């Protein structure tokens, strides 16, 4: 259910400052968004997977906290990443 190494590398290359930038808030938010989108398609098929749904809610919460941090520290990057990922904020 997780992303492949190639998918993660592509996300890091797109949102990171360089190829090894995996810790920046932008990259973490983009990776969480990709995982959340992947899990949403999983739950369309497996409606009773409550344990997995709990993990999804945890990811959403972690992404929300990272977005709040980014908004507090760098509003321009926050606005950019919201637009690039198509989030509703």
UniProtKB/Swiss-Prot annotation:
Aminoacyl-tRNA synthetase is among the record's keywords: no
Keyword vocabulary terms for this entry: Ribonucleoprotein, Ribosomal protein, RNA-binding, rRNA-binding
GO molecular function list: rRNA binding; structural constituent of ribosome
One of the protein's GO biological processes: translation
GO cellular component terms given for this protein: cytosolic small ribosomal subunit
SMART domains recorded: Ribosomal_S15
PROSITE patterns listed in its UniProt record: RIBOSOMAL_S15
Keyword Thylakoid attributed: no
Pfam families for this protein: Ribosomal_S15
Function: One of the primary rRNA binding proteins, it binds directly to 16S rRNA where it helps nucleate assembly of the platform of the 30S subunit by binding and bridging several RNA helices of the 16S rRNA. Forms an intersubunit bridge (bridge B4) with the 23S rRNA of the 50S subunit in the ribosome.
Family: Belongs to the universal ribosomal protein uS15 family.
Subunit and partners: Part of the 30S ribosomal subunit. Forms a bridge to the 50S subunit in the 70S ribosome, contacting the 23S rRNA.
This protein's name: Small ribosomal subunit protein uS15
């Amino acid at each position: 259910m997780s992303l492949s190494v190639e998918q993660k590398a592509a996300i890091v290359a797109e949102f990171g400052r360089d190829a090894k930038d995996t810790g920046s808030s932008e990259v973490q938010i983009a990776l969480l968004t990709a995982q959340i989108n992947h899990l949403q398609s999983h739950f369309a098929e497996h409606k009773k997977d409550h344990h997995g749904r709990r993990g999804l809610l945890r990811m959403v919460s972690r992404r929300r906290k990272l977005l709040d941090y980014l908004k507090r520290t760098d509003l321009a990057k926050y606005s950019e990443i919201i637009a690039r990922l198509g989030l509703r904020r």
